[in-house]
Amino acid sequence: MSELIMYILATAVVSIGVGIVAGKAIFQKDFSKQETEAKEKANLIIKEAELKAEATKKDKQLEAKEHFLKLKTEFEEDSNKKKNLIIQNEQKIKQREQTISKQMETNTRREAELDSLRENLSSQLEILNKRKEELEKLRHSQIEKLEKIAGLTGEEAKAQLMDTIKEEARTEASSYIKRITDEAKMTATKDAKKIVIETLQRTATENAVENCVSIFNIESDDIKGKIIGREGRNIRALEAATGVEIIVDDTPEAIIISGFDPVRREVARLSLHRLVQDGRIHPARIEEVVTKTAKHLDEEIIEIGERTAIDLGIHGLHPELIRLVGRMRFRSSYGQNLLQHSREVAKLCATMASELGLNAKVAKRAGLLHDIGKVYPDEPELPHAILGMELAKKYKESAEICNAIGAHHDEIEMTGLISPIVQVCDAISGARPGARREVMEQYIKRLKDLEQLALSFDGVLKCYAIQAGRELRIMVDAENVSDDKAGILSFDIAQKIEKEMQYPGQIKVTVIREMRAVNFAK
């Protein structure tokens, strides 16, 4: 048994050894074959790499050669350009050198000519000086001979001759001046008449006269009771807020608004219109509507001023001057509407200035602004012409226009040609039949003076002259004026009116002191 095992083991060992030897031989054979193939592939790769390297080398050499040729060509072209430029510059330099040489030759020749001219002039000057001396000697000798013959010295003869010539010239000049003056007077009178007639013919005017009453039409008389209010409280509130007199009488379907200030009358009329349309009429609502209406009317005044300036072709007016022009619509002068009058004067001035060959635009501007002093709200103690001139200066109007405004009533001296034109046209506009009513102007001035007198007292807030100046209603500051002082103030104002003013009949002075306490519930 053991022998069999030994035999099997021996056989296995021998088989393994033979297998190892055979495997080694086969492996060596395969390895040699792979090694040979690898060497062949390596040689092939090396050859291909060498071929590619050779080809790349040739390409790079070609590129380098082409780049070199390109640079060479550019260099040659640049060199040629620079050579050409150098050649051109050299030619220019040569030309300049030639020009300079010619100029130097010319200058040299001229210097020589000038030297010769100097010599000739010097010699001629010497000759002239000698002749001058000879003539001077001859003149003196002739003068001496004439003095001996005439028995007069040279100065005496000269003075006698001058006196004779002066007398003849004075006589001729006097005759000539008289003739020219007579002709100028005849021509000026004729031309002035012609210009005024042509100006009047070219101006179409309306014959409009203002009054102190406005009529407010209503649909039915039932509304009158609402306007009057309980115990007249509504109408009193309306009169106190607007400063006019509201007359509610038997006139059918009409309420009369009386007041000398057209702005106040217009505020009252518009306020009544709004209140009637709204239907709510009570003191608080009246104050609210009057305030809004006054603000709206102020905007309308500016719009009227702007529209007037545009219609007349006047540009560049200061906004405050435009406001004053708009206020003219609600102001009358001797019963004549001030805006209509100013527009009329502006057109007349433009026409007359164009006939005289002057600046029509400047004349038109001066004509429109000549009465702005009448509508200035503060109305200081100055003539309206001087006040208008100061306002025009304040708002940068030209000196010519300022003088025309200030001189149109001869308060100052006229310095420009536009000033007499404005004065004449103002007179033409006011002198038309029916254009003005002096009584109306005096009446309005008396009412204004009455209000100004009351406003001069301390504590007075507002003052309105109503009922054609027969009543003066004064609103005072409740904090500064007590009930006792209100009576004293009324007496003092009445006494001052008696001393300083002239008036028919009597004037009722009413001082109104109103105390209001307002709080808000939140």
Curated annotation (Swiss-Prot):
Membrane topology summary: Single-pass membrane protein
Taxonomic lineage: Bacteria, Pseudomonadati, Bacteroidota, Cytophagia, Cytophagales
Record-linked SUPFAM superfamilies: Eukaryotic type KH-domain (KH-domain type I), HD-domain/PDEase-like
Recorded family membership: Belongs to the RNase Y family.
InterPro entries for the chain: HD/PDEase_dom (IPR003607), HD_domain (IPR006674), HDIG_dom (IPR006675), KH_dom (IPR004087), KH_dom_type_1 (IPR004088), KH_dom_type_1_sf (IPR036612), Ribonuclease_Y (IPR017705), RNase_Y_N (IPR022711)
Subcellular location as annotated: Cell membrane
Protein known as: Ribonuclease Y
Keywords carried by this UniProt record: Cell membrane, Endonuclease, Hydrolase, Membrane, Nuclease, RNA-binding, Transmembrane, Transmembrane helix
Keyword Nuclease appears in the UniProt entry: yes
Documented EC number(s): 3.1.-.-
Annotated ranges, domain KH: 212-272
Annotated GO CC locations: plasma membrane
Domain HD: 338-431
A biological process from GO: mRNA catabolic process
Gene Ontology molecular functions: RNA binding; RNA endonuclease activity
